[in-house]
Every structure is written in structure tokens, then in C-alpha cells.
């Protein structure tokens, strides 16, 4: 489930976008007002929080119809989360317990055990989709807002920063500063 759940949610986001952008209309028989209800399909936006933000970050690499994205409480780089997250359990301590890793051995994003965990989930980690966040190469890039809480215990803000920096606009911004 961990390797496919977020990818399936990204596909569901794309399918929902297709439904919304292909003349979403409520006919007068189904309308509570008795008149047809039409929606503007020119500017469709996405808001995803937590797991919705993670699946949205994946969908953003493929969906060409959504012009504005808000990814709230989402992050990339599971290795960061494994080392930083303490709620509901201290994942670093859990790893140490199951692997009998001594307290004297430092765990970091580059430790072989953490790298193995990261490799296992790379296919569904949003940080790997962030460089492709502009699928409309010929059109203007979508507007993207990534938010995180400084004290978010589920999604450490370092993971949101890592995901945002992996995006294409961050690279353009950084190269213009150098």
C-alpha cells in the first residue's frame, strides 16, 4: 500500500480534474434552485492537506488542467520524516529498537539503513516528482503554494522545504541568485 496509495490518489486527482473540466453542469431537474448550475472550468484549483498534499504533489507533475495548487502539510524525503518525526512514535528510536542499532551510531539521511528505507519509498515520494511540476511546457507554469507548520509533528517543515526546493522554480530562482 505504501508504494501505491499516493500514486493512486494522484490518478484519482487527475480523473476528478477531467470530470470537472469537461463541462461540469447540474441540470435543472437536479438543481436545488430549479435552474441549471454551471461552473467555470477555465481556472480549476487544487487544495490538498497532509496526505492530500502529498498525492497532489505527485499529480502536479502530470496534470495540465489545474492552474493553481496549494500543498498544505505535505513534504518530501521520507528520510527526513523518519529522523525528525516523534508523533505518534519516535521513528528513529523504533528503527534503533528493531535493528539493535547502538545509540553511539549516528543516524542521518546518508546512513545505509535510512537510505534503504528511502529507496523503498522513492517511487511514491513527492520529492522525486517536484522537478516535473510544470507539465505544460508550452503554457505558463502553474501557481504553487507549499505551506508547513514550524512545529508540525507529523510532517516536519524540513521535508516541506526539501520538496519545495526540488521544484523547477526553485532551481531557476537559485540559479538567478548565483
Describe each PLM feature range.
Residues 11, 44, 49, 67, ...:
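Residue-level detector of short, conserved catalytic/binding motifs and their immediate flanks
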Residues 22-84:
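Primarily recognizes the serine-hydrolase "nucleophile elbow" in alpha/beta-hydrolase
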Residues 8, 12-15, 54-55, 158-162:
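Extracytoplasmic/secreted proteins, especially bacterial periplasmic and envelope-associated proteins
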Residues 74-178:
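The feature captures the conserved acid-bearing segment of alpha/beta-hydrolase catalytic domains
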Residues 2-5, 32-35, 54-60, 126-136:
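Generic recognition of flexible, low-complexity loop/linker segments
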Residues 3-6, 10, 49, 59, ...:
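Hydrophobic alpha-helical scaffolding
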